[in-house]
Amino acid sequence: MFWQGVPPDASYKAPAVMNLQTLRRAFEPALRRLLHVYWRFARGMTLGVRGVVLDTDNKVFLVKHTYVAGWYLPGGGVEVGESFRDALARELMEEGRIELVGEPKLHGIFFNSYASRRDHVAVYVVRQFRQDRLPEPNREIAACGFFDANALPLDTSEGTRLRISEVLENKAPVATWR
């Protein structure tokens, strides 16, 4: 399921979209470093949470952000005073209109050296949820949908692919995000 006109492997891109993507790719590493310098002083260590959301056909829910290239598991930062579960519930609702109806299962906590030397991500497996509809595109999420694990979009991140593989193939988690 995709938003109309946004297939995961679209080869045609309008010139304005190509220019925005080129600019984003050029500035993305610097922006990431700048944000992590801020977070270092504001928070010391950063914690994130992501969900491997699987429907009854074992299709996995992925999101495509407006500010970073590729497809990812839904999730985000854990706020001060917030539990991992509460952060997961908030992020799933914000990014996918997904409401937890059962308890998510912790898959693992991973060191994400790609983001910074202080970043850790808790990954949960979510099989019991409710979603009334896909969300409309917004300033954070450009597209989202459920995908067969054997037919993920080409630009799905390496860490996302690894987590999906671990969950669906019952593999032991690798300690780093990648």
Residue ranges and their predicted role:
Residues 2-18, 70, 139-178:
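Nudix hydrolase/Nudix homology domain
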Residues 14-50:
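Acidic, metal-coordinating catalytic segment for phosphate/diphosphate chemistry
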Residues 53, 123-127, 146:
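Short, well-ordered beta-strand micro-motif
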Residues 55-95, 177:
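Conserved Nudix-box catalytic region and its N-terminal flanking loop in Nudix hydrolases
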Residues 99-108:
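A short coil-to-beta-strand element that immediately follows conserved catalytic motifs
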Residues 110-133, 160, 167-171:
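Active-site-adjacent beta-strand/loop module that shapes the phosphate/pyrophosphate-binding cleft
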